């Protein structure tokens, strides 16, 4: 029987093989996802259900078409300059990354194209396979004028090192696939039409291993990231909320 959560979330298409490989594909109406307030609301809840399902031995995250995630509908996030609304965003934002890491199964990212919105989702994976045309960036935060404090700052600092991460955040640097591989952001770069197949092949190899080994190994390897995210997102998202409120104040003052 197909679990009910497979079809519960409008921006997530899910399917699972008999060997326990769950593929989670981001989309909007069957095309590349446009990240919205609804997606922000749904993700922590979907990830909790995925993590609770012990039939998921390996999880693959991927996008649709030529993009992983490259567009965001800022207006759909609501009036996040209001404390009550930001509290909701704060709760959801912190738990997305926590719950990704709390899935007790190997997480493989198949980055099928540019990841300039929430690229931290794929960089949190245990194994990241990228298309040769993939690009990693943080388009929304600096573009909107708000602090990148939702955890993306932690992930890039862990993977790039402190100085490179600060440069990345402040300059809106775009890191192309081959450079990302050299810097250690991704594990493999493959032709575009081979991304999912390569991720699936790795997943099939892992799915043959004992499930307790898979669960407990991923648990052991993620402890540092969990600690860093817990520390970094508390202050980071508070500062992000302050800058969101300031943007609204500046707009009101200029009106």
Each predicted region: which residue ranges?
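Structural motif
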Residues: 21-25, 60-62, 108-110, 129
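Catalytic-core regions built around general acid/base machinery
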Residues: 46, 92-104
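A short, well-ordered alpha-helical element
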Residues: 35-57
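Ligand-binding pocket scaffold of soluble enzyme catalytic domains
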Residues: 5-15, 21, 30-31, 39-44, ...
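C-terminal alpha-helix plus adjacent terminal tail
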Residues: 1-22, 28, 65-69, 75-76, ...
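Terminal peptide-recognition signature
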Residues: 24, 43, 61, 106, ...
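Crotonase-fold acyl-CoA enzyme core
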Residues: 99-211
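Glycine- (often His-adjacent) and acidic-residue-rich active-site loop
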Residues: 55, 62-95
């Amino acid at each position: 029987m197909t679990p009910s959560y497979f079809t519960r979330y409008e921006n997530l298409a899910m399917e699972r093989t008999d060997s326990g490989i769950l593929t989670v594909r981001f989309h909007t109406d069957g095309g590349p996802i446009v990240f919205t307030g609804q997606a922000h609301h749904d993700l922590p809840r979907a990830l909790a259900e995925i993590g609770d399902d012990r039939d998921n031995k390996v999880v693959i995250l991927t996008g649709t078409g030529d993009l992983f995630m490259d567009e965001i509908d800022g207006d759909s996030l609501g009036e996040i300059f209001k404390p009550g609304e930001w509290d909701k965003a704060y709760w959801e934002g912190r738990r997305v990354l926590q719950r990704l890491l709390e899935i007790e199964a190997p997480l493989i990212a198949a980055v099928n194209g540019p990841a300039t919105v929430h690229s931290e989702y794929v960089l949190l994976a245990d194994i990241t396979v990228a298309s040769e045309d993939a690009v990693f960036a943080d388009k929304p935060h600096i573009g909107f004028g708000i602090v990148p404090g939702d955890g993306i700052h932690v992930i890039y600092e862990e993977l790039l090192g402190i100085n490179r991460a600060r440069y990345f955040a402040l300059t809106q640097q775009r890191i192309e696939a081959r450079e990302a591989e050299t810097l250690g952001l991704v594990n493999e770069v493959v032709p575009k039409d081979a991304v999912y197949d390569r991720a699936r092949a790795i997943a099939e190899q892992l799915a043959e291993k004992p499930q307790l080994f898979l669960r407990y190994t991923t648990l052991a390897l993620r402890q540092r990231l969990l600690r860093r995210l817990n520390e970094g997102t508390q202050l980071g998202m508070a500062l992000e909320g302050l800058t969101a409120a300031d943007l609204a104040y500046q707009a009101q003052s200029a009106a």
